From Swiss-Prot:
Zn(2+) binds at residues 196, 198, 203, 245. The keyword Zinc applies. Belongs to the KduI family. It comes from Burkholderia cenocepacia (strain ATCC BAA-245 / DSM 16553 / LMG 16656 / NCTC 13227 / J2315 / CF5610) (Burkholderia cepacia (strain J2315)). Pathway: Glycan metabolism; pectin degradation; 2-dehydro-3-deoxy-D-gluconate from pectin: step 4/5. GO terms for biological process: D-galacturonate catabolic process; D-glucuronate catabolic process; pectin catabolic process. This is 4-deoxy-L-threo-5-hexosulose-uronate ketol-isomerase. It is an enzyme of class 5 (isomerase). The keyword Isomerase applies. Binds 1 zinc ion per subunit. Its EC number is 5.3.1.17. InterPro entries: KduI (IPR007045), KduI/IolB_isomerase (IPR021120), KduI_N (IPR027449), RmlC-like_jellyroll (IPR014710), RmlC_Cupin_sf (IPR011051).
Length: 278
């Protein structure tokens, strides 16, 4: 497991390109037939991917020892969104079907977690976020139709997009984890602009549906000290609460957002005018 320490904004603004990438970019989210995880000290979120390319991928019991508990979800909850072919997730001996662009929430205490594909010619790919939890809520799946869609932006400002809120209080209860997916329409390039911060939670963006020769220029940093990280397909960026999180691509793309912290109200944001960015 890759462990990332938290970082102060005063330190972050002094970093060069390599330093910014080392602290904030998760380059290798997926590995075939493996569970890849990055542990951030920022709100103790775990970011990762399970890719059952040729065989099922099990959450190993050894992860519990790394976390100082009996098993990974002994004091955590987990959300996963499938960006690949149809698949399934087994929890406590029960198998749950999770189709393409569908999600599953696994409550605190879940054991025997296994990720699988229906067809290895088109394997599932599960992007996951995992956060500390204090209460056990039921495991359940969420379809795209159930994900509280909201369309925002305008083609004239190159940011027409639909937000699918899979794991939010209006859909199901969680301790603190929120997750969703934003799909940009063809010709739209910007996400989350005008941008914002949120003092009461952190966020991770995971970008996908990008061609091999495409990229997203992800903006981060304090509003008056912005920096950028170049992100390619199926890579993630960690955003502390003090940082903006926005981006512009060389083509339209999709991204998954995940948040952990003390407030789950989706609109709890500190908005920043474009004129105030530096």
């Amino acid at each position: 497991m890759d462990v990332r320490q938290g970082i102060h904004s005063e330190h972050a603004k002094a970093l060069d390109t390599a330093g910014l990438r080392r602290h904030f970019l998760v380059e290798n989210v997926f590995a075939p037939d493996a569970l890849s995880l990055t542990y951030s000290h920022i709100d103790r979120i775990i970011v990762g991917g399970a890719w059952p390319a040729t065989r099922p991928v099990e959450v190993p019991a050894s992860l519990g020892a790394e976390m100082g508990v009996s098993h990974l979800l002994a004091r955590r909850e987990l959300g996963a969104i499938n960006i690949g072919g149809p698949g399934w997730v087994e929890v406590d001996g029960q198998r749950h079907a999770v189709g393409t662009e569908e999600a599953i929430y696994i409550g605190q205490g879940g054991q025997g977690v296994v990720f699988g594909s229906d067809d290895h010619a088109r394997p599932a790919k599960f992007y996951l976020n995992c956060a500390p939890a204090h209460t056990a809520y039921p495991t359940r799946t969420i379809t795209l139709a159930q994900a509280s869609p909201e369309t925002l932006g305008d083609a004239a400002t190159s940011n027409r997009r639909t937000i699918y809120k899979f794991i939010v209080p209006d859909v199901l209860p969680t301790c603190q984890l929120s997750m969703g997916m934003t799909k940009l329409e063809p010709g739209s390039l910007w996400n989350t602009m005008p941008c914002h911060t949120h003092e009461r939670r952190m966020e991770v963006y995971f970008y996908f549906n990008l061609a091999a020769d495409a990229a997203v220029f992800h903006l981060l940093g304090e509003p008056g000290e912005t920096r950028h990280v170049v992100v390619h397909n199926e890579q993630a960026v960690i955003s502390p609460s003090w940082s903006i999180h926005s981006g512009v691509g060389t083509q339209a793309y999709t991204f998954i957002w995940g948040m952990a912290g003390e407030n789950q109200v989706f609109k709890d944001m500190d908005h920043i005018a474009v004129a105030d960015l530096r």
